[in-house]
């Protein structure tokens, strides 16, 4: 994975809760849970599943989710 953001927090997905258009994704990063709101489409494109390794990517006022691959 190559990304310009410098703050990448590696963790495990502990919850993926889809709403009508937006999903809330919770990632456990060394005992601290980080929550991100992303589109349902992004969840599907990333194939996010509970137990999967993922990254909370923090840039300015945004938190994004990324995976290896």
Label the model's feature ranges:
Residues 1-69:
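Non-catalytic connector elements of ABC transporters
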